[in-house]
Amino acid sequence: MARLAPIVPSWPDLPANIGALASTRESGVSAAPYDDGQGGGGLNLGLHCGDEAAQVHENRALLAALLPGRPAWLAQVHGVAVVDAATVQPGQAVQVADASIASTPGVVCAVMTADCLPVLFADLDGKVVGAAHAGWRGLAAGVLAETVKAMRAAGAGEITAWMGPAIGPTKFEVGPDVRDAFVCCALQGEDDALRTAFKPCPGRDGKFMADIFALARLFLARDGVTRVFGGTHCTATDSARFYSYRRDNVTGRLASLIWIK
C-alpha cells in the first residue's frame, strides 16, 4: 500500500501553528466502488455510504496517523449547526451538525464531502480554527456565516479561509430551484456576482452551470472574510484523486481537516 499523500492547502495566510489537509481517494483499503479508481484500495472515510465498516475504520486509522488527535466526525445534514469539536467524543452519539470550531490544540475539526464544498477557517492569530460542509443548501442557508460567527464568539480576530475539493463550475448543472435559493437572499449590489455564478446551460432551457466556489466567496465577503484561497480542485473531473457523488452516485467520502498544533 502506498503512503498517504493528502493535499496540503496552498494557503499563504495560514498561521504557522495551524495544520490542515484534505484527503484524496488514494492509498486506502476500500474495494470498488470505493476504491482508488485505478484497481487499488480507496481511502473512503464515510461510514454512511455502503462501504464495509471495517474498511472505513482502517482508512480512518491511516488518516489518524497524520493527525494530532481523533477527527471530530459529524452527522452532516446540509444544515447550519456549528459545534465545538472538543465536545465530540468517542463513545458518544455522533453530533448532528455541518460545521465545527476548535480553540484547543490537538482538537481536529473535520468535514466529509463528495462534491459539496468543504471550507476550512483560521484566524490570523492562530487561536481559533473551523471547518464547514457547504453543499448548496447549507451555503444558501448560511452555514459559512454561522461558522464565522461561532469562531468570533470564541475569540477569533481576522479570519482567512481555504476552499477544498468540490464539484467545479463545468460540472455542476442545477435547475432554477437552486438558483432561486440564492437569488432570493441576494443583497443589494450582488446581481453581477450571481450572474457570474449561474451561467445558462447551452441547449438546456432552465438549467444553469453553478460555480459553488464563487458563491462561497460571495457569502464569505458578506461576513468580512476576504482572504480566501483554494477552489482549484474539481471532484467531478478528477476521478483519479476524488470521489464524486454527481459522477458516480455510489461512492466514498473525502475529508478536509484543520487543527491547532
Q: What annotation goes with each model-predicted range?
A:
Residues 1-261:
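Active-site microenvironment for binding and transforming phosphate-containing groups
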